[in-house]
Amino acid sequence: MFYYLYDLYFNHLDSLRIFSYVTFRALMAGLTSMLVTFWFGHKIIDFLYGLKFRESVRDDGPKSHEIKKGTPTMGGLLIIGSLLISVLLWGNLKNPNVILLSVFSLSFSVLGFADDYMKSVKKIKGGMRARTKFILSILISFIFCILFFYYTGTTGQTGKISFQLTDLFFPFIKGPVIALGIIAIPFSILVIIGSSHAVNLTDGLDGLATGTVLISVMTLGVIAYFSGTPIVANYLNIPYLPGAHEYSVFLSALTGALFGFLWFNAHPAQVFMGDTGSLFLGATLGMIVILLKKEILLLILGAIFVSEALSVILQVGSFKLTGKRIFKMAPLHHHFELGGLKETKIVIRFWIIAVILAIISLSTLKIQ
């Protein structure tokens, strides 16, 4: 809004030119969303508690989780609300992808909310039917992938090499590696849904998903700024994507919202994000890496999410084939819990690993 007003009415005033700078708007977006989260945090928590939107724990889960029963859930409303307010104020609303990204995130948050509502209020065990949730996830992803490819265009530039936006890039390798062509759409849907459900599986300990997603979002914010700045993109020999630096404003707003939410979600958690938060956070990560041409990099940056999802796949597959379990419990963080590690130690160690993965991910921009 501020950028739009400046561009429309005040672009002749040098003193207000700062509102056109991406760096300033990104910093202010992060600060705004964090303050909004702090301000409304307790109010939203009390509101959720009053409506009996409360967490239930799995019957076969760790005994230490019994204390979490009754904690307000659907805290993702606080994250998505703070994010959208901040983007509305500081984002470039003339950039269609900023609008699309916001609506895309909101769509997955609504899907997660419906799932949480069925579990917490309607007391339907397991919430929304898995098939229904899966089909809706595919439908949302398909619609927005088509829209993003339409508004973003089809070609780009990396150094002296031209590329199609349907091409696939690999870390440590210059230029596009695989031309996906028409397969780009189903591949993108796979990335979004995989990321969404992987983050959802990671959300099992106080602050675990919040902190790890936060680190990934901050990293992608840096990459987005570099990708949208031609001098930096050409220097690093990464895909130059016009307008991509505006994603850094969106990601900064999301960073601030996550920092604010972590204040309430850290152990012992006063609120859980629920599927309302985890589904949209994972889906947003997936869409961002698609837009930045960093789909494969997500395997490094989001290795924690990948390992959590993989542990579930291996556990289920092993039990069906052999009748034996590989882990004490899946997802992976529960395996460590039952192994005797305290919840806070697991969370902090996962955060440390996430920081290391972020550093490695950023290093791939130059090491190629």
Curated annotation (Swiss-Prot):
This is Phospho-N-acetylmuramoyl-pentapeptide-transferase. Coiled coil: none annotated. One of its GO terms (biological process) is cell wall macromolecule biosynthetic process. GO terms for cellular component: plasma membrane. It comes from the Bacteria. Pathway: Cell wall biogenesis; peptidoglycan biosynthesis. One of its GO terms (molecular function) is phospho-N-acetylmuramoyl-pentapeptide-transferase activity. Catalyzes the initial step of the lipid cycle reactions in the biosynthesis of the cell wall peptidoglycan: transfers peptidoglycan precursor phospho-MurNAc-pentapeptide from UDP-MurNAc-pentapeptide onto the lipid carrier undecaprenyl phosphate, yielding undecaprenyl-pyrophosphoryl-MurNAc-pentapeptide, known as lipid I. PANTHER family: PHOSPHO-N-ACETYLMURAMOYL-PENTAPEPTIDE-TRANSFERASE, PHOSPHO-N-ACETYLMURAMOYL-PENTAPEPTIDE-TRANSFERASE HOMOLOG. NCBIfam families: mraY. The chain crosses the membrane at residues 31-51, 73-93, 98-118, 134-154, 175-195, 213-233, 249-269, 271-291, 296-316, 345-365. It is an enzyme of class 2 (transferase). Its main location: membrane. Keywords: Cell cycle, Cell division, Cell inner membrane, Cell membrane, Cell shape, Cell wall biogenesis/degradation, Magnesium, Membrane, Metal-binding, Peptidoglycan synthesis, Transferase, Transmembrane, Transmembrane helix. It comes from Leptospira interrogans serogroup Icterohaemorrhagiae serovar Lai (strain 56601). It is a multi-pass membrane protein. Its cofactor is Mg(2+). HAMAP family: MraY (MF_00038). It catalyses: UDP-N-acetyl-alpha-D-muramoyl-L-alanyl-gamma-D-glutamyl-meso-2,6-diaminopimeloyl-D-alanyl-D-alanine + di-trans,octa-cis-undecaprenyl phosphate = di-trans,octa-cis-undecaprenyl diphospho-N-acetyl-alpha-D-muramoyl-L-alanyl-D-glutamyl-meso-2,6-diaminopimeloyl-D-alanyl-D-alanine + UMP. InterPro entries: Glycosyl_transferase_4 (IPR000715), PNAcMuramoyl-5peptid_Trfase (IPR003524), PNAcMuramoyl-5peptid_Trfase_CS (IPR018480). Belongs to the glycosyltransferase 4 family. MraY subfamily. Its EC number is 2.7.8.13.
